[in-house]
Amino acid sequence: MIYVLYGQPGSGKTTLGKYLEDYLKHLPTNGCDAVMIDGDELRTLFTNANYTKKGRYQNIRNANAIATYAEHVLSRDTIMMLVNPYKCLRDELRVNNKCVTEVFLWTKRSLRKKYHVKNFEKGEPEYMINTDTSPTQTWKTFKILLQL
């Protein structure tokens, strides 16, 4: 399963992803760590400080390639935590992978506004979560929605 946690910067993607990672690690039927793909870490790894559309496309395509490899070769759950503002790139991931769950996270908080993407393409995710509550409450909401 590939979990795509996406939304504007500061919406809680990494925080929620860490909760999900811990949950999956402790499942009796799973027993191994999920592959974590954090957009900011990818930018550091591939030295991509380009926040234009071209730079974002490259970062997301790198993430999609890693997630596809983890799914098909490693048979591991993957948690993607990226801004991921382009529906066509999320659709590309779905073409190559059968088990993809999209969760759009949003907040009214004003965090990291200079990195926000104009014309963000929310698309039609399976789930949408407002993260203006505490991280613990957001995690509870996530578990209920995804029936974990």
Where on the chain are the PLM-derived regions?
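Hydrophobic anchor at the beta1->P-loop junction of P-loop NTPases
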Residues: 5
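ATP-binding Walker
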Residues: 11
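Small-molecule kinase domains that catalyze NTP-dependent phosphoryl transfer to phosphate-bearing small molecules
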Residues: 106-148
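Conserved substrate/cofactor phosphate-moiety recognition/catalytic segment
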Residues: 18-65
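Walker A (P-loop) ATP-phosphate-binding motif of ABC ATPase nucleotide-binding domains
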Residues: 2
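Walker A/P-loop
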Residues: 14
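P-loop (Walker A) phosphate-binding loop of NTP-binding proteins
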Residues: 8
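Glycine-rich phosphate-binding loop used to anchor ATP phosphates in small-molecule kinases
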Residues: 54-97, 105, 109
